[in-house]
């Protein structure tokens, strides 16, 4: 068998942690998903690299499989979980957009993903204030199925797409509220959520 804290007997596995984070992001446990990502960022910043396995105290285990397994799982967790960008067509001609950025401490950020081989890029800019939040999405011409996480204790008063008011449906996932709507993008759209401040 393995000693306590090694391999299947208690080691911390980045490739498992990445999948757990993605599942948390996509099933109503968004804050837990971010907590996992944040702790992994701290490990990488501390060590300057990624280990295949870690001891429960966070120190690296010197041998094992390829570190790229863990890196790939975390990239997927950020791409499809935190940023919530999923290509459900061909080269993003149809995509799911379900960002979880409100659970992070960032008030403004930019996220870029895509396919290097065919120069397909999805570029998202996010900003949140006391009045609302906004996403500017640069992408190939596509149909975008949007599933937008609302910040805790916030409700949507109005939703605008490129300055025009848009209808949406509320969906509760666990304890998290989402706004659901579909849009057609010709390369760039702006999504603006105005918060209802009457219940704050």
Task: List the predicted regions and their residue ranges.
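Alpha-helix N-cap/N′ positions at the starts of helices
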Residues: 15-16
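Non-catalytic C-terminal accessory modules of carbohydrate-active enzymes
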Residues: 2, 6, 19-200
């Amino acid at each position: 068998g393995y000693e306590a804290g090694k391999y299947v007997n208690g080691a911390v596995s980045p490739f498992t942690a990445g999948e757990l984070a993605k599942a948390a992001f996509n099933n109503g446990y968004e804050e837990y998903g971010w907590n996992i990502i944040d702790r992994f960022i701290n490990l990488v910043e501390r060590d300057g690299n990624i280990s295949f396995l870690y001891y429960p105290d966070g120190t690296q285990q010197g041998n094992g499989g390829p570190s790229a397994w863990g890196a790939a799982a975390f990239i997927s967790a950020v791409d499809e979980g935190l940023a919530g960008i999923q290509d459900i067509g061909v080269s993003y001609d149809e995509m799911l957009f379900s960002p979880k950025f409100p659970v992070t401490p960032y008030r403004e950020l930019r996220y870029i993903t895509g396919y290097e081989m065919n120069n397909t890029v999805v570029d998202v800019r996010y900003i949140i204030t006391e009045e609302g939040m906004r996403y500017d999405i640069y992408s190939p011409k596509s149909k975008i199925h949007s599933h937008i996480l609302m910040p805790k204790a916030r409700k949507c008063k109005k939703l605008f797409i490129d300055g025009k008011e848009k209808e949406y449906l509320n969906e509760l996932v666990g304890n998290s509220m989402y706004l659901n709507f579909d849009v057609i993008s010709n390369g760039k759209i702006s999504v603006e959520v105005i918060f209802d401040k009457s219940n704050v």
